Amino acid sequence: LFRSDVEKITSLPIVGDVPFSENKSSEGAIVVHENQNDLMAETFRNVRTNVLYMMKSNEKVILVTSTTTGEGKTFIASNLAVSLALLGKKIVIVGLDIRKPGLNKAFQLSRKEQGISQFLANPEHTDLMSLVQVSNINPNLSILPGGPIPPNPTELVARESLPQAIDILKKHFDYIILDTAPIGMVTDTQLISRVANASIYVCRADYTHKADYTLINELGEQKKLPNLCTIINGLDMKKKKYGYYYGYGKYGKYYGYGKKYGYGYGYGAENVNKK
C-alpha cells in the first residue's frame, strides 16, 4: 500500500520508501551508522542499491531535489552519502542549495563560513579542495558546504565554474552527491542538472501535494532532470492503514524561502497535518 497511490500518478521508478524518523539526537539528521542493521539502515541500503543500478560504471554524480522545503531532501542526500561511504567508496556531498544551506546543521560542521559558492564566484583564485571537510561520521565521507550565501545564486550555478568544480571532485571521489534547491521554487536545480548523471526527487508522505506530480512527470518526460527517480519519505510504519494523504499537506508558508527550513524529515517542519 505504501507505493500504490504514487504508482498510480507517476511512472517514474520509486527507489525507496523511507520511514518517519524521530531521531533527535545530537547527531541530528544522520540516521545511518556503521555496523547498524535497523530498519533505517536497511532502507538506505536499498536506496543505494537501486540508485547505483540506474547508473553506468563511469557515472558519479547524483542530484537530490524536491518540490519545496521540508520534504527531506537534505536528510535523504546526507544518509545516502553515509550509506555509500560504508561501501568503502570515497564520497563527497556538495551543498548546492546555496540560498539556504542545510549541510552545516546536518553534519554539525565547524567551518560553516567556507564552501562551494566561493569557488563558483572566483575559481581562478580559490582552491576548491581546501573547502572540503572530512566528516566526523566516516573517513570516506567528505562535505563541501554551500558557503557564504551569494546575492546571485542562479547566475552563479549557471557559470562554467560549476562543471569545473565537478571535474575537480571527480578526480578525488568515487561518487558526488548534490544537495540542490527545491526545484518547484527556483530554477537553480535545472541549471545544476547539466552536471548530474542521476536525479532523486524526494516526496514526503502527508505533505507533498498530488498536483506536484504533474511537475515531477513533466521533468521526467522532458528529460530536464537526468535519469529521474523518486523517493517517498516520512512513512509512518506504525499505522496499520496508512494512506498517502496527498492534497492535504500544507506548505504555502515555505514559498517565502526565508521561513523555517526543514532540512530533514521531522526537523524544522511546522504545522504538518497528521492523520
Residue locations for each model-derived region?
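Short boundary/hinge segments that flank catalytic cores
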Residues: 2-90, 96-102, 106-116, 122-125, ...
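Phosphate-binding/switch loop-helix module in NTP-utilizing enzymes
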Residues: 51, 146-187
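Residue-level preference for the first positions of well-ordered beta-strands
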Residues: 61-63, 90-92, 141-143, 175-177
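Conserved G/P- and acidic residue-centered "switch" motifs that form tight phosphate/ATP-binding loops
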Residues: 74, 95, 179, 197
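Well-ordered beta-strand positions
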Residues: 90, 175, 198-201, 229
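Short, conserved active-site loop motifs that form the nucleotide-linked donor/cofactor pocket
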Residues: 140-141, 228
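NTP-binding/hydrolysis catalytic cores, primarily Walker-type P-loop NTPases
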Residues: 160-163, 191-193, 274-275
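Inter-motif core of Ras-like GTPase G domains
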Residues: 171, 185-206
